[in-house]
Amino acid sequence: MKKLLTLVFSVAVLSFCGCAEKGAQVQAAGGVAEPTGDVSTYLRGAYISASDAEAKLKAAGFEVLSTFESVKDGKTIAFTCPTLKAEGAKPNRANVAVMRLFVDEQDKVIAITNPVYFGKAYMQKEYNHALFSKVKAKIESAFPSLKDSEDKMSFSNLAGFHFMIGMPYYEDVEVLGEGTTAELIAKAKNYKKGADVAFELKLSDDTTLLGYALGGGTKRFVSKIGRQNAGLMPYPIVISGGKATMVKAEYYIALSYPLLTMMEFGGIASVPGDIIKDLNKPFK
């Protein structure tokens, strides 16, 4: 990883392509016009406690899966709904099944993952704007006065996003282990007596999405590059098709931190490898 970054940094700025697309933009599904400009990564709002946030989500019809300490004085609430689960049950789309609400008890704000942003990134050509815009509207109804984050990306670039030349796309997953779905889930839950499993969401007989804690040393990168986006933790693991996989950290971190520069990414160059080591352990 470090060698790759050194090589990338040595080339001209023209080699940078953080918003590169892979494939043509598709027409909006469901008869609802898709955004034509930038889409915010998060919806930010005034501080409320984690318990109050959970109550609001449940009242709006969302299913709260867990509340996880993602950073010191900060909690991530993982939540879903029938629409997200149905979309996540489609082949290679499990990551879209869960949205996150980060409660920052230090800076007294909340941040919610934007279903339109992550929906387009994870669903790609199968994205249905009518569905994901309704999920977003339901969130905004439950949490009035939310504002778009400064973190954002052009909607048309989300489906084919990768950080730069040589970096992975969404589909370039890391295989953590192989076996039956039941065997892989059991391994994840038996490791450390299940202490690192933040949530478990069954999407079909063959597919389950886990939220998994990283090691204490590994997860410090969040505070280094910006605790405001700590909702990316716990790390998602997909168990499907006889494999446990994770989206590559170079992709997941850059998607969650679209304002991250090459120099800032270079400052956490060892993190992608450390994440693989952490998440490989349960499946050995």
Tell where the protein language model's regions lie, with residue ranges.
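Bacterial Sec-dependent signal peptides at the C-terminal "C-region" and cleavage site
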Residues: 16-25
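Bacterial N-terminal signal peptides
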Residues: 8-15
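Charge-dense, helix-prone N-terminal extensions
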Residues: 60, 79-83, 91, 95, ...
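Mid-chain, structured segments of secreted extracytoplasmic proteins
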Residues: 75-114
